[in-house]
From Swiss-Prot:
TPR repeats lie at residues 103-141, 530-563, 1042-1076, 1099-1132, 1141-1174, 1183-1216. It is found in: Cytoplasm. Residues 150-186, 764-801 have a biased composition (Basic and acidic residues). It comes from Debaryomyces hansenii (strain ATCC 36239 / CBS 767 / BCRC 21394 / JCM 1990 / NBRC 0083 / IGC 2968). The gene is CLU1. This is Clustered mitochondria protein homolog. GO terms for biological process: intracellular distribution of mitochondria; mitochondrion organization. InterPro entries: CLU-central, CLU_dom, CLU_N, CLU_prot, GSKIP_dom_sf, TPR-like_helical_dom_sf.
Length: 1323
């Protein structure tokens, strides 16, 4: 059993006793009763403190000791010791409850700082702190609150007994089963509900998406919060003078209440009190009011409450606002372990900067009494956490939680500092070197720009290669963090891309930057590398102490030990376990570190040989094109599978697989049997076998992975946007440099499919023509054998009815999917090329001119129809600071920019765009969004017009205010001088974008945060329990896993969001419908806040949530959620995504099941309309839609319209899948039976008219006429023949349901099945 399985099994079997903690609270807390807290014996004192910190009763108590009887647990035991160990040491036996006492501790300055921070959090100032410190505007917002949703309908969960009972019922007759199903699913809607459904349906089909202003408006929950005080600052009288320190004074603070009263407060070791100091006089003595009363309390919040009548009232109002604004705390909770997503479009007026004098003092009270909290040894912190014990589940949870917290704090600090590096706010360590080579060391983090500063990539692409390898290094670090190999350490790393520049942030190896220990007599400095290629490339080290610790890494990356030979007789002493470029370094902390991991996967040699040639202008930018780890892993798995199969067959032949003692022998393959040399094609004297293996993996991308991706894409969901496509490709191990090849192949495959359809249609039309001729021939030969043939046909039909009905049609939108893939691929190539151009051109542009440059570039690219030579307007107050070279970008025009983009696409993606690509292949708005997300631009939410017609409509509303200097002559006659005066003018727009439209630039952060292996193990255990039928145990494990996710990642995190989505699916499958809906709603909120309000993850979360609401029989909520998803979908993709057809059709069937035929018909017509544009009028998917629509029309009693749909469907089916296909026959049957029924109806109406006419005539002649029935009987007796279709007595006087059964062939309705390889999308 593997360690993973063992830990999972331990989790499943672990039974930890729960006890109740009865906690007596100190006198400063006005709570007469003891606090009861459920706890596990496995929890630590730190966990108990955390629980108390979250409890409403004790959240303000920050400085206390925990006592058991007279024993101070806080002083006698470490905070990380489990409660079980404490009780054992104290000699306490098995108990169900434990009595503890909390006692106040005397404050010190550090405790005062902690208390002030907690006070700010409790009163709500941390919300303002969060918004003011975010690098983006309105980061982490959601739009979920804008949707008009009712509470989730509570339903009884389906038990296994219910499912068994349902299974038994299905064994009865089909008629009974259908009746039962109809009764069970029948829902009665009120008139108001029907009106709501109709309104939402009309919105769904209207195609009118909300304006961009509405899209840029988000839930503003935190903005509704009022501050219960005006300010709380460190007083001007701080720090405490020496003569007051001995009296217990620790800090002086100044409070301004909502009543405009300013008070000076002393923070004393015994608590807080108002002193006699004023703005100009210092008097630290306690203040007494006119009644002889003093204001003093151990808790600051109690003191402020006694001083300000409005204080508690405002806090209560804020709590009410939060509860009313959202029923889900996830929408406003501040994340603990994750950077939030910043929307690409925002309304800056919604972001008001609240005054708070204490905000600028936060670094003082948040980083310790001497500022030491700000200076962190990030590497030591991270590695020390990694070395914590992890033998039990609880130890692993604690360890993972601390690792995630450490990584997040590192990312946050590194990002903020990197932005200051790019803005030029910091002094480099090497100021005399060129700007690109500057390096920085700040707060334990080393910063360098992503350039070829060391010269390592001089021959393989220079700066482009250096930039690329930095991201490959990070990808390998991320994987190593997950592998968690013992004895070897990697660096904490993140990459920050901001305003076109890349900064690599790493916690350095201890001692690597320290040159003080080097021998002064040595001519050259000692190389710190112990394993791998030296820094200058002159020597290869192979310290034997690294060999054992590197083996787990080599195994994870499937690396082959190999000798290395370079030029100038640089050789390795024996085999290297890893690549020569991966370096092993010993730190001064005696740990072994591994750095420069960009060569963890081999080169894509096939791509290099085809596309890299430095002598050509159109060469790929660099030679460091590495394969993705996912591709290598997939190649390795398939090779192992082949070997395993061969070994199994060999052992079977030898009879060695026979079971012994009921157990089958295990087949174990050596882990090093399939390995790869990642140094292949980078050295000399290489093994041909090594090169062949690398070439094989390189070919594997095009020959297998891309082919499989194209096949899957043709029949599954096409990507929504560029990020979705990127994610899909990366998961399958395909590098984005293949986007051009994918675009080409999408067109090729589309043409092949159309050709296949044309050929099939030709064959079917010939068959139809042949049958028609045979039918006519038979008609002329006579009808003697008609009855026998009809009888034979009936028998054959009955036999076919008894068989399972399977259609050979292809009902996936294959053509539309390939068109969609092609368009998204081209859009992604263009967007990424624009990002690189913005980066390269802006390298020489000063930071404060970047907004002007970016807006001008957008005008040239997207505004050519409006102004092909747009003027770039620079603020007059800035022009004087910059030279002509720095303003060179203002000479760009549309033709130049479009040509630059096309050339960049060719260089980076090996794809040649057609000359008219900007007008024929690109949707301007969607490209505008993609560029914003990739470069990190936040645009003002307003209407952006990309055509002349649209621009004329909006330009007056978007007049530009600009400041210009205007000459003004002095009025004095003696001194007539020209003076320049700065005035503000409002001028009409001549371009789509202006500089002020850019609200902010946000950094794009790539970090080394990884997915915990522990959560995967627990999830697999839960899934196994459910699969075995232990549903309750499985659900309990899933619920526990949710708690684990929240502990490790925090409640607001992308991984937590994904798990909420997964958990809702499992709940729905297990019949827990209400729970599924509630969890799915949280998934929507978290996806919006962490991945973006319009990301593909958010849209998918909304669609899933809508689906779960519909399964819970709450169709109004479901339609509202679908409406939100489709609006965002249209914004992201544009009109007509292939999968939207199925979404509309499924919604239509959903409504038709509940007799809402009018709304269902509208949705079907919308689906058919979109499908016609995407797939063509005569396509199999349109035929299937019309077939389904016909069924809905039948259900609503609209037989004539149904007949039209079935006729169209039959025509399509016979042409494309042949007249013998089940769908062709079924649709023909519908056509025949409906025609017969309609003819009978017409005959009935005609007879009734005749009868009425005769009756009227007889009445006039005073002669009694026979009734219509009598007339029919009479004519029948006389044996007269009627040319009209004869009435069928079987369908006379039948109910609508019976008529439908007759039309369907008098057989119980069967569900038509497609080919088994056609999967039905949930959409």
């Amino acid at each position: 059993m593997s360690s993973d399985e063992a830990s999972s099994e331990a989790l499943a079997q672990e039974d930890i006793k729960q006890i109740t903690l009865r906690i007596k609270l100190p006198a400063c807390i006005s709570n007469e009763e003891d606090l009861e807290v459920p706890s596990l014996l496995s929890e630590t004192l730190a966990d108990i403190r955390e629980t108390l910190n979250l409890s409403a009763a004790t959240q303000n108590l920050t400085n206390f000791n925990v006592f058991y009887q007279d024993i101070n647990l806080s002083e006698n035991f470490d905070d990380l010791v489990p409660l079980n160990d404490i009780l054992t040491e104290l000699g306490v036996g098995e108990i169900d409850s434990l009595n503890l006492v909390l006692k106040e501790k005397p404050y010190n300055l550090a405790a005062i700082y902690d208390h002030l921070n907690k006070f700010r959090e409790v009163i709500g100032l941390h919300f303002l702190d969060k918004y003011s410190s975010e690098v983006g505007v309105l980061s982490g917002v959601s739009k979920f609150g804008d949707i008009d949703l009712q509470d989730v309908k509570e339903t009884e969960p389906e038990t296994q007994d219910d499912k068994d009972k349902e299974t038994d019922e299905t064994k009865s007759t089909k008629e009974d089963s259908n009746q039962t199903e109809e009764k069970k699913s029948e829902i009665v809607f009120t008139a108001e509900e029907k009106q709501q459904i109709g309104k939402i349906t009309d919105e769904l089909i209207s195609g009118n998406t909300p304006s961009l202003v509405e899209f840029g408006t988000f839930d503003n929950i935190s903005g509704s919060i009022k501050t219960p005080i005006k300010s709380l600052t460190v007083s001007q009288w701080s720090p405490v003078p020496s003569f007051q320190k001995l009296k217990g004074d620790l800090l002086y603070i100044t409070l301004q209440t909502l009543e405009n009263e300013t008070l000076n407060i002393t923070c004393h070791l015994s608590g807080f009190f108002v002193n006699k100091s004023s703005t100009i006089n210092f008097n630290p003595a306690i203040k007494m009011n006119e009644n002889g009363k003093v204001h003093k309390d151990y808790l600051l919040i109690n003191l402020v409450d006694s001083l300000s009548p409005s204080f508690s009232k405002t806090i209560q109002e804020n709590e009410l606002v939060l509860s009313r604004s959202s029923k889900h705390p996830e929408s406003f909770l501040i994340p603990s372990n994750s950077l939030m997503s910043s929307p690409w479009i925002v309304n800056p007026s919604k972001f008001a900067n609240q005054p708070d004098a204490s905000r600028s003092q936060l670094p003082l009270i948040s980083n310790g009494v001497d500022g030491s909290g700000f200076v962190k040894e990030w590497n030591e912190d991270f590695q020390a956490i990694r070395e914590l014990p992890n033998s039990t589940i609880n130890e692993r949870i604690l360890r993972e939680k601390l690792l995630m917290k450490s990584l997040h704090e590192f990312n946050k600090v590194a990002t903020e500092t990197a932005m200051n590096v790019i803005k030029g706010n910091l002094t480099p360590l090497n100021p005399n070197e060129p700007k690109d080579y500057h390096i920085y060391l700040r707060n334990g983090i080393f910063y360098s720009l992503g350039v070829n500063a060391t010269g390592a990539f001089d021959c393989t692409g220079g700066n482009e290669a250096a930039r690329y390898t930095s991201s490959k290094d990070l990808a390998a670090i991320k994987l190593l963090n997950r592998i968690d190999a013992k004895g070897i350490y990697n660096l904490v790393t993140c990459i920050v891309d901001y305003m076109g520049q890349r900064v690599i942030c790493q916690a350095p190896v201890p001692g690597i930057l320290d040159s003080s220990h080097e021998d002064e007599n040595e001519e050259e400095p000692t190389d710190k590398v112990c394993y791998g290629l030296s820094t200058d490339g002159s020597k290869i080290f192979s310290d034997s102490s690294f060999e054992n610790v590197l083996k787990p890494i080599a195994e994870a990356f499937h690396l082959k030990p190999h000798p290395v030979t370079l030029l100038d007789n640089v050789k390795s002493q024996g085999d290297l376990i890893t690549s020569k470029d991966i370096k092993g370094v010993k730190g001064t902390d005696e740990r072994k570190y591994i750095i420069d991991l960009y060569r963890a996967t081999p080169l894509d040699i096939e791509f290099i040989e085809s596309n890299w040639d430095e002598s050509k202008e159109t060469s790929y930018p660099h030679r460091e094109t590495a394969l993705r780890h996912e591709a290598v892993e997939e190649w390795w798995k398939r090779k192992v599978s082949v070997l395993f199969k061969a070994e199994t067959e060999r052992l079977e032949k030898e009879g060695k697989l026979e079971s012994k003692d009921g157990e089958k022998p295990q087949i174990v393959l050596p882990s090093d049997q399939i390995t790869i040399n990642t140094d292949a094609f980078t050295t000399i004297d290489e093994s041909s076998d090594d090169q062949n293996e690398v070439r094989e993996v390189s070919k594997f991308i095009k020959e297998h992975l891309i082919e499989e991706f194209l096949e899957e894409n043709s029949k599954q969901i096409s990507p929504f946007d560029g990020n979705h496509l990127t994610s899909m490709l990366h998961k399958q191990g395909i590098n984005l440099r293949y986007l051009g090849h994918i675009a080409e192949q999408a067109c090729v495959r589309k043409d092949e499919h159309l050709k296949k359809i044309t050929e099939a249609r030709k064959v079917n039309e010939e068959e139809i023509s042949k049958r028609k001729e045979e039918s006519e021939k038979k008609a002329t030969e006579g009808k003697d054998q008609d009855k026998e043939e009809e009888k034979a046909n009936d028998n054959e039909k009955n036999k076919e009815d008894d068989k399972e009905e399977v259609s050979n049609g292809e009902f996936e939108p294959i053509v539309a999917n390939f068109d969609s893939l092609y368009r998204i691929s081209v859009q992604e190539m263009v967007a990424r090329s624009v990002k690189h151009l913005l980066r390269k051109i802006s390298a020489d542009i000063p930071v404060y001119l970047i907004p002007a440059f970016v807006s001008h570039f957008h005008n040239c690219l997207l505004g050519s129809e409006i102004n092909s030579s747009p003027e770039c307007i620079i603020d007059e107050t800035l022009k004087g600071f910059y030279n002509a070279t720095e303003l060179e970008f203002t000479k760009l025009n549309s033709n130049k920019v479009i040509a630059l983009v096309a050339n960049e696409v060719l260089i980076r993606f090996r794809y040649e765009l057609p000359t008219d690509w900007i007008s024929t292949l690109i949707r301007p708005f969607q490209l505008f969004r993609e560029i914003a997300i990739k470069y990190g631009i936040q645009w003002k939410s307003q209407e952006y017009a990309f055509t002349n017609e649209e621009f004329e409509k909006v330009k007056d509303k978007l007049a530009v205010e600009t400041q210009v200097f205007e000459a003004k002559t002095s009025k004095h006659k003696k001194n007539k001088k020209q003076q320049s005066q700065l005035i503000t003018k409002s001028v009409d727009r001549t371009t789509i974008f202006v500089t002020d439209d850019i609200v902010n630039f946000v950094p794009i952060v790539k970090d080394s945060t990884y997915r915990s292996s522990l959560v995967d193990e627990i999830f697999e255990t839960a899934r196994a329990q459910i699969f075995k039928g232990e549903t309750e145990t499985g659900i309990n494990l899933l619920n526990n896993l949710l708690s684990v996710y929240e502990q490790i990642y925090g409640r607001v995190h992308p991984e937590t969001s994904k798990f909420y989505g997964l958990l809702s699916q499992y709940y729905a499958e297990l019949g827990l419908k209400s729970e599924a809906c509630n969890i799915a709603r949280k998934a929507c909120i978290l996806a919006e806040r962490t991945t973006g309000f319009d990301s593909y993850e958010s849209i998918t979360a909304y669609i899933n949530s809508a689906f779960f609401e519909s399964t819970n029989d709450d169709y109004i909520n479901a339609l509202n959620l679908y409406n939100k998803a489709i609006n965002d979908w249209t914004l992201v993709y544009g009109d007509g995504h292939p999968s939207s057809v199925n979404t509309y059709a499924n919604l239509a069937e959903l409504l038709s099941e509940h007799k809402l035929f009018q709304q269902a018909n509208k949705l079907f017509e919308k689906a058919i309309s979109i499908s016609t544009k995407l797939n063509g009028e005569e396509s199999q998917i349109c035929g299937m839609l019309r077939y389904r629509y016909g069924g809905t029309l039948l259900g609503g009693g609209d037989f004539k319209s149904a007949l039209d749909q079935f006729k169209s469907a039959n025509d399509i089916f016979t042409k494309f899948i042949g007249p013998d296909d089940q769908l062709s026959k079924k649709s023909l049957s519908f056509v025949t039976n409906i025609s017969t029924y309609l003819a009978y109806n017409e005959h009935q109406k005609s007879e009734q008219k005749k009868a009425l006419a005769q009756q009227a005539s007889a009445s006039n002649g005073k002669v009694k006429a026979k009734s219509a029935v009598e007339q029919q009987l009479k004519s029948s007796k006389k044996g007269k023949k009627n040319d009209a279709t004869q009435p069928n007595p079987e369908i006379a006087s039948k109910s609508v349901d019976d008529i439908l059964q007759y039309i369907e062939g008098k057989n119980p309705k069967k569900q038509l099945k497609k080919k088994s390889n056609n999967k039905k999308s949930k959409k």
